[in-house]
Amino acid sequence: MKWVESEWTVPNAFPPPGAIPGVWYSASTWIGIDGDGSPDVLQAGCDSDVMNFIFGTMRQLNPWWEWFPEGTFWISNFPVSQGDTMSCLICVDEGSNTSARIYLMNDTNGAHASFAVTAPSGTTLEGNCAEWILESLEIDTSVPELASYGAMYFDACNSGTTDNTFLNAGNANTMNMLDSNGNVISEGAIENQTLVRCTYEGPLP
């Protein structure tokens, strides 16, 4: 894979049924290259976190990018709210598997950011897949439980290969998120050639 793009609406995350007060829950939306069957992931998106506490509910939204196995880079001065429309394009530099560019935009308020990024030492991009993902974001080896998010959609799910083959969601396979008992808590579905739906199917145990 050489590039991947999409746009999506930032979900309104809620604590799942049985949520523990004082514990953060996450619904992170992102697109990327690699990760399924490869040790690297080049990715960017927005993390939606939510926590119940004694005085109510606290939320935070943080745009980010990451070239795993290096850690997450949080993007500052990039305002985002639930319900905003985000768009992202990730492009590998021509003839390279260690450098790329990331373009992230909040189409609702006009905020935008771009980054020229370099692979972590010893890492190369395999380019074996493009991804459109909703999950609980792993942050520095810590993985919060999944927040309840209802349903959300990735639109304009397009990608391309180094030999200029154009691909989209119609060429993709779906993967579901399971709890520790094997129950589906987040389900993916391909709605059409460029539209992917993610649906919360909790609650968590």
Where are these regions (language model features)?
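Exposed, interaction-prone regions of secreted/extracellular proteins
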Residues: M1-P205
